[in-house]
Each structure stands twice: as C-alpha cells, then as structure tokens.
Amino acid sequence: MRRSINDRSLIVSVNPTSTISEVYRLLRTKIHYLSKDHESKLIMVTSALAGEGKTTTICNLATTYALEGKKVLLIDADLRKPSLHRIFSLPNNHGLSTLLSGGTSAHSAIQETMVGYLSLLPSGPVPMNPSELIDSTAMRELLESLKQDYDVILIDTPPVLAVTDPVITSTLCDGVVMVVATGRVKKDHLRKAKEQLEHVNARMLGIVLNRMNREDQQIFYMDDYGTKG
C-alpha cells in the first residue's frame, strides 16, 4: 500500500514546476553529462559532515529520475542513523540490514513509494556490525543483482568523516556525488573527505554546493570535483 510523503523534503514530487524542482532536474542532467563516458547506474550521494543536505538531495534527485520514467531504487545505506523511511512514510522493520544478514529477501525488503517508478530499500533495524555488513560479499552480490532490475540506483550513506561505511560503499559504486553545505563546512573537512574517497579510488562525479535562500529552500551548483581545491 502506498503512503504519504514528506512535503517539505520531496519538493520535486509535490511542486514539480517550482524553481527548486528545476534545479534538481539540472542536477540530474549534470550528473548524466559528467558520466556520459562511463556508465553511472549505481551512484552514491554523501557529505563530509552531518546536516549538509545530502538526504534531501538524494530523495529529490531520485524523484527526478523516476518522473523521467526511469525505474529507480533508492537505498538507505546509513545503517546507524537511517532516515529515508521517514521521508517516504514507510516502515523500517525490514531493509538492508536484515537483507544482508539473511533475515529477509529483496522482494520483501524493497517497498514502493508514492512516486511512480521509485522504490525504496530502507536501512532496516540498526545492526550491531554495520561496517561489516557493508563490507561483505552479500552487499557486493546484492548490488550486482539489483543493477539488473533498475535503471538507476542511488545510495544514501553516512557522512564520510563520521564512519568508514561510505568509503567502503564508494568502492562498489559507479560514481560518487558529494553534497557540501557552503558556509558551514570548513575546507579542511572537505579536503579530508575527498582524500579518504580518493584513497580507495572512488570515482568522483562532482560536488553539489548547497545554499539556502530566504524560503529555506536548497539551491545547488554542481562542478567537477577535480576543479575544487
């Protein structure tokens, strides 16, 4: 059964003609352009620190792909502080954690959202060993299998500087997008996050500079990560 969504977080769904919704569509186009020479079917969205807007970004980005008619799967790989199930008003009894530990099947864990063509694999209950689950053969096999069923898979992770999970996840993805809250994150934080991802040869698609306007809506600018100091 499909349920309601968080109007504030999913502006692309509730107000697709708004200026901010158009900016999210431009972000989707930019990602497509930056990955045109290399298939980017499995994309991770992360940030250096918490509270930079990565989760709102990935939810709206996923929605733009779905509204384009792409079959999209959104994965909540933040096994420590999950949030995507709340945005889509869906249960979190089963999800990625139970799937990787053998407690459920992908068919049972993946849920439909109110957005057509957009499905969600929530995090599931917080496990005792999140890093071990992410860095497992089961995770690798799961993602390879899911790539056969979806046009686009977007993965939300914890902040890079918080835990090792996103660095591990980046090695399993075709590309990584970093969300940066301008005026909040220091250059040293961004540099350290970049170095950690580059150390494992993560393929950086670009950074999204997240700013706030008078209505507290997010505005984005995306550039090739390599152009940033």
Regions found by a protein language model. Give the residues of each.
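P-loop NTP-binding module
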Residues: 1-229
